[in-house]
């Protein structure tokens, strides 16, 4: 039992950070679509706010 518990904990420590980093990539259908729509709405309504939030992206388009 002790050996099994240690193995389970080590798996959780490896999997949880991976899911946290790859969450948007792992679930594009659920999170990606909503994030994209909300981002487009923000760009249409307030370019000034976006220039502060996404300076690198705006430089690429210049």
Swiss-Prot record:
Renumbered to this chain, region (NEI-like) spans 44-56
Enumerate the GO terms in the molecular function aspect: melanin-concentrating hormone activity; type 1 melanin-concentrating hormone receptor binding
Which residue stretches belong to region Melanin-concentrating hormone-like? 60-62
* Region spans: NGE-like: 23-41
State the family named in the UniProt similarity comment for this chain. Belongs to the melanin-concentrating hormone family.
Pfam families noted in UniProt: Pro-MCH
Q: Which InterPro entries match?
A: Prepro-melanin_conc_hormone (IPR005456)
State a GO cellular component annotated for this protein.
synapse
Instruction: Supply the PANTHER family for this chain.
Output: MELANIN-CONCENTRATING HORMONE (PTHR12091), PRO-MCH-LIKE PROTEIN 1-RELATED (PTHR12091:SF1)
Query: What is an annotated GO biological process for this record, any one?
Result: chemical synaptic transmission
Q: Can you tell which superkingdom this protein's organism belongs to?
A: Eukaryota
Region Disordered: which residues?
29-62
- Give the protein's recorded name: Pro-MCH variant
| Organism, scientific name | Pan paniscus
């Amino acid at each position: 039992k002790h050996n099994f518990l240690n193995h389970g904990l080590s798996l959780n420590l490896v999997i949880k950070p991976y899911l946290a980093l790859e969450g948007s990539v792992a679930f594009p259908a659920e999170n990606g679509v909503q994030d994209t729509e909300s981002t487009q709405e923000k760009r249409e309504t307030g370019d000034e706010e976006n220039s502060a939030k996404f300076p690198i992206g705006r430089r690429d388009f210049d």
